[in-house]
């Protein structure tokens, strides 16, 4: 489906859309687990296959639609960034996640309508001893040790928050390339012997269309090059100044002592012998260093792949040096090259991902506000989904995993999946409370048993799916796998323990029952 949508829209596969197939599988599997478990539960109650299939559509279908739509809206916020790659990711994810719902809600009942009725062996998993014992322990903790649950989750949140401050953005040109690959080893060789392979260029132009080849200007360029010598990250520069220095050495019988800027008179003589014209094959190199109008020149360096943080620091220091040497009213100086483009692109992509992730959290929260029109219910629904994100961010800070495009994506993916379990839990709980007119405790007891089983099955399946990513050769994909798995496991714990504990805390509130049973849109 995803490949078909990309083809219809004319989008090409990229780093981000490449993460959608496993994500769609995860969402589809989660939907299937909830639908099939409900089908087995209903069939075990009355033994009527048609009635069971009808009820999974009426009872689980609405919750599944709301879950998928909320997730799709969260991912769809990427469309509103100004980065084409993220726009495509937002459009494709929004369309395909909603399509997954229709495939599940139509395909699963239709398929099971042709299959034989479930056998006792097939529905035996509903009585799994280990899972039922675990859910029994969950209920015991929720009903008897709420304060202990609050204490552990508050402690976990505080501890994680302390490590969040260690988190920092950092990206390299060859960030996710395997360290053992031939490509990476070749890049290391060039970096060690040739000071890297990333072009770092400085373009100098005169404002008044004056001659760039004057002694005054070239002397400033020479001063800039000498100032940049203190940076071991830079290679030896290639510029018209280097050509002039070499020419000065040549006319002085190759004496190394004359490899320096000549005086103004000698410089004029040397420059007169260097006509700048692209048609002259002998001067093709010079035409790449100084333009034909003689109003601009280029200083070309190679720089090591030092990472976005160090590169940003170097850029700021170079900018200070440039401003000190070249008066802004006389010269226009610009840093360019692949390294500058990488830095700007990485900063822009990181900012877009960060803002899109933030807005996805906000929009999902607003969507939940339409589902649960009560401030307290929104807070109760959001808290169990924020804590896993803090735990993941704290874990990244503790282990020194930097923020980069491949890791920041974890927060949006994980939040979109964990919020599904929250919505499913609350909708099921409210249905139990309204239909049977039970107390909050009785409704929670039934909800934990009904939703808990599917939640455990789905989280185990999803985490196993993301765990496969850890076997990837690319570090970004590895991090995406184990970080998403960690977030989902923490989210499951929060939805099984913290969420019902907070709902139970509303039991004696004056308006609790009205808030909990208020009609869902």
Regions found by a protein language model. Give the residues of each.
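A general structural motif
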Residues: 178-191, 275-284, 315
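Solvent-exposed, polar/charged alpha-helical surfaces in well-ordered, non-transmembrane soluble domains
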Residues: 219-222, 226, 316, 320, ...
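Juxtamembrane segments of multi-pass membrane proteins
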Residues: 141, 145-270
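Membrane-embedded transmembrane helical bundles of large multi-pass transporters/channels
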Residues: 1-172, 306, 316, 323-521
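A cross-kingdom signal targeting lumenal/periplasmic-facing segments of multi-pass membrane
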Residues: 264-298
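Short, solvent-exposed loop/turn segments at the edges of secondary structure
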Residues: 20, 72, 195-197, 294
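A short beta-strand structural signal in non-transmembrane regions
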Residues: 200-205, 211, 286-319, 334
């Amino acid at each position: 489906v995803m490949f078909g949508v990309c083809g219809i829209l004319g989008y090409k596969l990229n780093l981000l859309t490449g993460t959608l197939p496993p994500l769609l599988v995860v969402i589809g599997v989660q939907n299937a687990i909830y639908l099939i478990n409900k089908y087995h539960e209903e069939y075990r109650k009355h033994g009527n296959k048609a009635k069971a299939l009808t009820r999974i559509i009426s009872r689980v279908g609405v919750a599944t639609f709301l879950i998928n739509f909320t997730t799709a809206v969260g991912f769809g916020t990427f469309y509103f960034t100004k980065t084409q790659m993220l726009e495509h990711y937002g459009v494709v994810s929004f369309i395909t996640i909603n399509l997954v719902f229709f495939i599940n809600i139509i395909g699963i009942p239709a398929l099971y309508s042709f299959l034989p009725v479930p056998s006792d062996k097939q529905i035996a998993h509903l009585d799994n001893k280990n899972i039922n014992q675990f859910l029994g322990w969950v209920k015991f903790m929720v009903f008897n040790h709420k304060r202990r649950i609050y204490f552990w989750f508050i402690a976990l949140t505080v501890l994680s928050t302390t490590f969040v401050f260690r988190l920092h953005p950092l990206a390299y040109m060859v960030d996710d390339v395997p360290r053992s690959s031939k490509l990476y080893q070749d890049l290391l060789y060039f970096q060690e012997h040739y000071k890297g392979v990333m072009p770092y260029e400085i373009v100098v132009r005169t404002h008044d269309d004056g001659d760039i080849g004057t002694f005054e200007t070239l002397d400033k360029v020479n001063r800039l090059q000498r100032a940049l010598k203190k940076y071991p990250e830079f290679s030896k520069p290639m510029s018209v100044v280097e050509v002039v220095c070499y020419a000065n050495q040549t006319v002085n019988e190759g004496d190394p002592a004359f490899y320096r800027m000549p005086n103004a008179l000698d410089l004029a003589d040397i420059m007169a012998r260097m006509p700048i014209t692209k048609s002259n094959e002998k001067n093709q190199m010079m035409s790449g260093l100084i333009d034909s109008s003689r109003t601009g020149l280029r200083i070309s360096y190679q720089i090591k792949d030092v990472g976005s943080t160090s590169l940003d620091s170097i850029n700021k220091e170079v900018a200070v040096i440039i401003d000190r040497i070249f008066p802004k009213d006389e010269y226009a100086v610009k840093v360019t090259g692949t390294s500058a483009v990488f830095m700007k692109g990485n900063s822009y992509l990181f900012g877009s991902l960060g803002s899109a992730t933030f807005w996805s959290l906000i929009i999902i929260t607003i969507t939940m506000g339409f589902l649960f029109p009560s401030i307290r219910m929104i807070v109760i629904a959001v808290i169990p989904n924020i804590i896993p994100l803090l735990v993941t961010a704290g874990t990244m800070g503790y282990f020194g995993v930097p923020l980069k495009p491949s890791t920041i994506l974890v927060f949006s993916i994980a939040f979109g999946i964990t919020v599904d379990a929250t919505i499913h839990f609350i909708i099921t709980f409210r249905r139990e409370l309204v239909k049977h007119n039970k107390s909050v405790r009785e409704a929670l007891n039934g909800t934990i048993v009904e939703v808990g089983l599917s939640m455990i099955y789905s989280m185990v399946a999803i985490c196993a799916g993301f765990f496969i990513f850890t076997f990837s050769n690319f570090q970004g994909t590895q991090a995406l796998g184990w970080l998403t798995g960690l977030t989902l496991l923490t989210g499951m714990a929060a939805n099984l323990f913290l969420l019902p504990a907070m709902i139970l805390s509303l039991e004696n509130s004056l308006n609790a029952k009205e808030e909990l049973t208020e009609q869902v849109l």
